[in-house]
UniProtKB/Swiss-Prot annotation:
Cellular location(s): Cytoplasm
This protein's name: 3-methyl-2-oxobutanoate hydroxymethyltransferase
Annotated active site: E181 (proton acceptor)
Superkingdom of the source species: Bacteria
Organism: Shewanella frigidimarina (strain NCIMB 400)
Binding-site residues, Mg(2+): D45, D84, E114
Cofactor note: Binds 1 Mg(2+) ion per subunit.
Any one GO biological process: pantothenate biosynthetic process
Record-linked Pfam families: Pantoate_transf
Length: 264
């Protein structure tokens, strides 16, 4: 199979082909996900919660992400590899550039940043310097203390319009991919239709171009709170590779996410 790039995902969007993404943190799981056909792998700052045992993602460092990116890279042959830029690692232009370079040198093909209008100059700067950017809107976990918890975003008209406007602005600034998290399904659909770049949803309904989940949720090994938008595929298949194939198949045929995984 040929390597997945941002151009591949744009082609999928144009063809109406739904694609899948998962988080990954080591070479073994990354290799299994990659060989089964997962299109995008994200070394997420979610590792702070699922690997390190924190209550949120804020303690994660650039060194943490770089280490796990290098691990995942060794297991990947096909999937597009994205690395999260963690909390307070992109506050100034110089810091943003230096930290993004660290992640690219560790093996990432793209970096992901959370935020809206305030990020536009950073997105433009990174893109102009050859570092592809995935933007992230809606529930941005690094802002959990501002939101007052992990809450659905964009439910009122003003905030929905703000998120849509930010999505368009981030695309114009050069973002090649967008993640929307925990927003109402109609808003996610409007964003997906308004943009030419691919949109990946998590807790955002079935009308985005792709879906992403945390691997621990897909495999039923998360402890504590289980998000409404997640699904335990290992429970229904009994085997890891079969679980991943079931996830890919259900995204492709539109049966995941179902209504019970969606916010309105």
């Amino acid at each position: 199979m040929s390597k997945v790039t941002s151009s591949t995902l744009i082609k999928f969007k144009q063809e109406g082909k739904k694609f899948t993404a998962l988080t990954a943190y080591d070479a073994s799981f990354a290799g299994a996900f990659d060989s089964e056909g997962v299109d995008v792998l994200l070394v997420g700052d979610s590792l702070g919660m699922v690997l390190q045992g924190h209550n949120d993602t804020l303690p994660v460092t650039i060194a943490d992400i770089a280490y796990h990116t290098a691990c995942v890279k060794r297991g990947v042959a096909r999937a597009l590899l994205i690395a999260d830029m963690p909390f307070m690692s992109y506050s100034t232009p110089e810091q943003t550039m230096n930290n993004a370079a660290i992640l690219m040198q560790a093996g990432a093909s793209m970096v992901k940043l959370e935020g809206g209008h305030w990020l536009l100059e950073s997105v433009k700067m990174l893109t102009e310097r050859g570092i592809p950017v995935c933007a992230h809107l809606g529930l941005t976990p690094q802002s959990v203390n501002v939101f007052g918890g992990f809450k659905v975003q964009g439910r009122d008209a003003d905030n929905a319009q703000r998120i849509l406007d930010e999505a368009k602005a981030l695309q114009a600034a050069g973002a090649q991919l967008l993640v929307v998290e925990c927003i109402p399904a109609p808003l996610a659909k409007a964003i997906t239709e308004a943009l030419t770049i691919p949109v990946i949803g998590i807790g955002a309904g079935a009308d985005t171009d792709g879906q992403i989940l945390v691997m621990h949720d897909v495999l039923g090994i998360s402890s504590g709170y289980i998000p409404r938008f997640s699904k335990n595929y290992l429970k229904q298949t009994g085997e890891i590779r079969s679980a991943i194939r079931a996830y890919i198949d259900e995204v492709a045929n539109g049966t995941f996410p179902a209504e019970e995984h969606t916010f309105n």
